[in-house]
Amino acid sequence: MKGFFQIFSVSFFAVLLWGCSNGGDVELGSLSEITFNAKHLSRGVLNQTTIDNGEGRVYVCGVQNNSTKIFNNVAITRDAATGKWFPSTKRNWVEGSNYSFHAYAYSTNSGLTIDSSKDGLEISVQQPTSYNEDAMIDYLLSHSFKVADGAMKPIVQLYLEHAMSLVEIYVVRGNMFDARLIKMTFENIYTQGSMKCTSQATANSGNRNVWEVSPSGDNDVVYTFEPTTSAVIGDKRENTEARMMIMCLPQQLTANTQLTIEYEVNEKVTPESPDNFVLHKEVFQLYNYQPVNYQSGHRIVYTATVDSGVNLEGVVAAWKDVDYIEGTVLPEID
């Protein structure tokens, strides 16, 4: 089979909105007390479980009547009984006042500088120079949640988005063939830079946070990710997909930036040779791509079926070049 991949677009701000509901919430404390709910996409170093368990730090900022800061980078923690989040500094709703809130969270403070005077909207990042899944900085910023009148007393919904870039490769089982994801290598990338949120989305608007990224240093770092156990599909009937992911600083792509994927497909199986895994190595040259079928605010998905019966789809996510453009990479089929 031929496995050459084409790049249609690699500047994809990969942020999905997720829903949450207040149904069944149990009130705790004063009915006038300002409480929160923190939700975000379960991917990256910080997922919903680690956030709920307090493994990542979550801080809230809040302004009353467009001028009075009532929450100044205040830590919030989750109450397990109700699922609601409470700040270390208590505040009550005031009827007739308007409010604006947002929050940020991070997985580690080593290599991360947060400008608290900018309420977490500006950061500096130094990611590890060799890829370590457990040591990567994961930074999240919520949408802005606005309340027109404190008399409404809502639970403040904090929808957190990842600010870092994600490179994800999926293999989806096609017909009768098994596949294994072996290794990802991302070459000549930046690991250091500053990031500034230039447009913060408002909750429930359908928009997303937009970051201005200024990398610094040299783009000569190589990230390699090899699963401890090869990601396998097809070993069980219900096991129909596998994926690998690298998280890093949003990149400004150069002619030297290259992504390499290694995977195996069980091909030409016979009764005498039930396991005939063939290694494939695909190289993505990520420079001078041309975006196609761009539509702001929507994830565009392309799929293709390789003749082995395995559907391959690669997603290169959240690159900062001229603008955030959505797209994917695809195998070329002959």
Where do the protein language model's features map onto the residues?
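Sec-type signal peptide cleavage vicinity
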Residues: 2-6, 17-334
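Sec-dependent N-terminal signal peptides
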Residues: 6-12
